[in-house]
Every structure is written in structure tokens, then in C-alpha cells.
């Protein structure tokens, strides 16, 4: 499981940062990639990665400001040009209005998509659990931006315990059907009468990962709830230390506020995203240093950076 940041900037494209988009790579888990936001130029950023557009099966939009959605029509159209690849349907999750935006863009431009898009639109009345699959649950809450904006919490369901194959062999169980039964949790009896109890050879279930994606927002308790015990919290950091008033006026957060959210939520790691273009290399290091006084495990992410979860 990995995160890759396609655009980490705020507002408009900059020389060193494109606008908002990131992907959650779930290739080992379910052979899919999930995208969060799709700002202008996202498809160009994808060309710098190993991501295959057909693997992107779900797109989650935080809100309808242009720096988070202007790349969608182009990406969807280019995804249709993958002639050498099998066409796969796509699901888009986002605020009410995202379907109208996409369908009108496709219609007006005369674009033809050889795959289906399934839309899931949300408002204040439909927050909470918005998706459940065999292996993942996604929750959403409204944040505190200047327009309706959603934060997402992706929860991996607990993983099955692993089989101690060496111990099972040492107990006299041969590879074959009996081995498979124990792996599936069944108790067995060997030819000599020895009883083998599956629980003695299978570890306890492993806790699944939690990834929280916080879109544009002022500091809000909703972010703490979404980030509770998260393995990774991706939080916007448009502004730096001392810019709290400006951040509040524009519906955004500072690095210090993001660090407070991570601390209060008990998150394990904080990745600062959606950074203003005025923060360059040295400024970003200072942003990390300042935030670390509140929450130690913090990093300002860069375009195309990959983070293993």
C-alpha cells in the first residue's frame, strides 16, 4: 500500500508544485488505484509515474474548487485512449454537482468514453460510511472550507492471521489437503491420531491500515474524528506558523494546526500537503521544524513523492 502525490500545491499550478491530486495504490490488496482530487495537469503528472490509468477505479473529490477538479475532463478523456489496455468502469465520489460538472464537460467537448462512470454524490445529509467493499470501508465528513468540502477516512479491514508453515511441518503435517485445511482454520487429525488445532499455528488477525485525507479546511473537530488513530494523516497546510488569521479568513489551515489535529487524533504520521507556492525548499524545512514541536513525525510532501504505508 502506497500513497503517491501528483500535485501538492495550493490554488494554482506553480513551478515546483502542481495543484491537488494524490493516489492511494492498493495494487497488492485489490489491484486498484484510488485517486483523491484531480486538479489541472494531473494527467501530465501521471506520465511521470508508473500508474496505469485503467487501474484507477475510484476517484474521490473533496470539493468543487477548480484546483481540485479542473483536471478531471482531460484525465477521463485520456483514460479512454488507452487502446492497448482493457477498458474498465470508473466510480466518482464527491459533493453534489460533480456529476453535472463532468457530464457537461464531456458533452460540450464532444468526448466519447468507452467505459461507464458511476457517480456517488453527497451532501450534509449523507455523511458517514460512503463505501464498503470486502477489504475496505470509506467514511466521509464535512470539513470547514468556504464551500462544501469532504474529508475521507479509508479503513482497511483487519487482515487474517498468517500460517506458521514451518511449525506445521515440524508437527508432522505434510503439504497437501491437510495443510490447506489448517490454513483455512480447520482442526485436523493425523493418521497416528495426533490432533492438530489450527489456532496453534495461525497468528492473531492483523490490524488494517487507516489513511485519512483532509481536503481544504479550517481547523475543525471533524478532522480529528476522521484522523483517529490513523497510520497516515494527509492534511492541508496552505499557511505557515503565525498565519492563523489569514488561514481562517480563507478557509484553510496552517502547519501548526495540522500538527495539532494529528496529535489530538493519535495519528502515527503527518504529511503536510496543499502548500502555498510561496513556501520553497528552506521554507518547507522550517514548516516541518515548526510543526514538529507539536507532532514529531511530520513531513512536507513534494510532487511525485511516494510514501509506503
Swiss-Prot record:
Zn(2+) 1 binds at residues 63, 65, 145, 216. Zinc phosphodiesterase, which displays some tRNA 3'-processing endonuclease activity. Probably involved in tRNA maturation, by removing a 3'-trailer from precursor tRNA. The active site is at residue 67. It comes from the Bacteria. Keywords: Endonuclease, Hydrolase, Metal-binding, Nuclease, tRNA processing, Zinc. The gene is rnz. One of its GO terms (molecular function) is zinc ion binding. Zn(2+) 2 binds at residues 67-68, 216, 274. Signal peptide: none annotated. NCBIfam families: PRK00055.1-3, RNase_Z. Binds 2 Zn(2+) ions. Its EC number is 3.1.26.11. This is Ribonuclease Z. It comes from Streptococcus equi subsp. zooepidemicus (strain H70). SUPFAM superfamilies: Metallo-hydrolase/oxidoreductase (SSF56281). Belongs to the RNase Z family. Homodimer. Its cofactor is Zn(2+). It catalyses: Endonucleolytic cleavage of RNA, removing extra 3' nucleotides from tRNA precursor, generating 3' termini of tRNAs. A 3'-hydroxy group is left at the tRNA terminus and a 5'-phosphoryl group is left at the trailer molecule. It is an enzyme of class 3 (hydrolase).
Amino acid at each position: 500500500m502506497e500513497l503517491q502525490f501528483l500535485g501538492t500545491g495550493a490554488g494554482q499550478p506553480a513551478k515546483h508544485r502542481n495543484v491537488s491530486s494524490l493516489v492511494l495504490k492498493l495494487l497488492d490488496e485489490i489491484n486498484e488505484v484510488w485517486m483523491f482530487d484531480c486538479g489541472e495537469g494531473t494527467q501530465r503528472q501521471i506520465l511521470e509515474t508508473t500508474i496505469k490509468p485503467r487501474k484507477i477505479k475510484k476517484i474521490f473529490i473533496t470539493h468543487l474548487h477548480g484546483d481540485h477538479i479542473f483536471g478531471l475532463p482531460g484525465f477521463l478523456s485520456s483514460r479512454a485512449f488507452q487502446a492497448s489496455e482493457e477498458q474498465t468502469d470508473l466510480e466518482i465520489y464527491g459533493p453534489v454537482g460533480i456529476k453535472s460538472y463532468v457530464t457537461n464537460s464531456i458533452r460540450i467537448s464532444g468526448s466519447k468514453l468507452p467505459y461507464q462512470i458511476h457517480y456517488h454524490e453527497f451532501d450534509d445529509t449523507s455523511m458517514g460510511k460512503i463505501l464498503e467493499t470486502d477489504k475496505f470501508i470509506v467514511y466521509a465528513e464535512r470539513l470547514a472550507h468556504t464551500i462544501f468540502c469532504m474529508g475521507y477516512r479509508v479503513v482497511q479491514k483487519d487482515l487474517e492471521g498468517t500460517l506458521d508453515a514451518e511449525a506445521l511441518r515440524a508437527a508432522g503435517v505434510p503439504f497437501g489437503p491437510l495443510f490447506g485445511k489448517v490454513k483455512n482454520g480447520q482442526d485436523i487429525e493425523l493418521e497416528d491420531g495426533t490432533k492438530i488445532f489450527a489456532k496453534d499455528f495461525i497468528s492473531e488477525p492483523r490490524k488494517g491500515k487507516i489513511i485519512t485525507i483532509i481536503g481544504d479546511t479550517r481547523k475543525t473537530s471533524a478532522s480529528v474524528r476522521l484522523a483517529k488513530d490513523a497510520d497516515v494523516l494527509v492534511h492541508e497546510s496552505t499557511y505557515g506558523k503565525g498565519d492563523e488569521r489569514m488561514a481562517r479568513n480563507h478557509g484553510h489551515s496552517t502547519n501548526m494546526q495540522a500538527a495539532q489535529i494529528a496529535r489530538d487524533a493519535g495519528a502515527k504520521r503527518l504529511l503536510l500537503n496543499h502548500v502555498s507556492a510561496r513556501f520553497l525548499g528552506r521554507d518547507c524545512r522550517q514548516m516541518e521544524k515548526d510543526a514538529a514541536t507539536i507532532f514529531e513525525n511530520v513531513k512536507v510532501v513534494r510532487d511525485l513523492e511516494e510514501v509506503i504505508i
